[in-house]
Amino acid sequence: GRTAQVNGLMSVTIQIPGNPSKFAATKTGPYEENEEIIVKVPTTDETPLDLTRLICMVNVEHNCYVTPAVGGEMDFTNPYPITVVDALGNKHHNTIRVVPTPPKTKYAKLWEKNAALLNMSSNTTGLAFYQNYLAIQEYNAPIKLYDRNSGEFVKEIPAASTFMMRARTDDAGHLITNRENVYGAGFMVYYYSEETQEHINLLNWTADAGCPDDLGYNMSVKGDVTKGVAYIYGMCPHNMEIYYWKLEDGQLVTPDAKPNVLRYGPAGGDWTSAPMIQRATLEDDSKHYIAYNRYSGATGDDAAYKAKFSMFTPAYEITSLNQDNHEYRILGFNVFNIENETYLALNDQQADTWSGGVSTLSVYDITDPSKMELGPDDAGYDKFCLFRGEWSPYATSYNSWGDLTTAIVPTDTGYDIYIATCVIGGDTSQTTIRMYKMTWYRQ
């Protein structure tokens, strides 16, 4: 004989009037007696979900029915009780709760100011989030701190030395700055002590000891430079080498003048501006992220010299971002983790005959690294490329200078991620700093 249909309710779907999308319950039936069935329906600040006007559709087993019947627009301000009578006449009781759910991420530009408005020169070469400020290292000048929410000037910190280039923060929040090796200055790295309000030298590779020209054109750190294991990375243009030093409890393990060297042959030739490099973890077998430019000042139309962003393992297993996802030059990037997810924020710029172009910020979900191969026309691209901002003002940038930095701030519903970008132009009207906020909602 046939099996009687005694499970009753099998699925629930909610629809917003006038919207073709349908939103299924977080789990399908059969359901336990008195089990609450949850349906998450998108909401935004701009178009908040109206719980009083929703369409409910249910699927029940054959010879089962809902009493009273559902249909038309219904009110889900409170959990909605539903009763299903099965083929044997048994009643099954459940409630349906609609949960307004923000999108996983949303984005807002908080402010935009050129160097003139920030009272700085055009060479705003280093960006770092330090405490609640945006710290800007002006090249060969002091560090200025700005309110990260408004862009208003707060105070100034004297530079650690001359020819200071980049600003970073380590994993413990210390402000780290570096000197570029120009005119024989040497590559020097400092952290700023809050206690003494002094810059403390961590690394000094002198020109006389063989430091390459322009080392410090880019720099990054991983770990806490004052305790435990940490790493400092220094890069320079016109080669294919990445230099790095290991520290333990604030002291160099790697001698100043004898850094570890990674030769990045996959670049296929010398990069023209020092690459951005980021170590993923403190583990010995950590992967790295790298972005480099081979653009040399000609019109940016030679595909062989277009910038590249890649992830590589110690064995040089490489996964690269599809180059259709960015403009000809990459000015800066940061890879950051939110709980179990990994995101890439990328600052790129076009390149015309005059080494100029507009710049923009984009954000990608690279939790699954294979998605990095997706292009704008591929299926699933909208789940990979989460945001692309508007163009900056045009900037002439012969050195391909720019930067990007992020700060992650926990909230009751998830996290706010501040993302600051800069493109450095030929004068103070072209150099532009922008502040964005990415809001990540726990689903």
Where are these regions (language model features)?
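Repeated scaffold domains used in trafficking and secretory/extracellular systems
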Residues: 117-128, 158-174, 178-180, 187, ...
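Structural motif
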Residues: 140-147, 182-193, 229-251, 273-274, ...
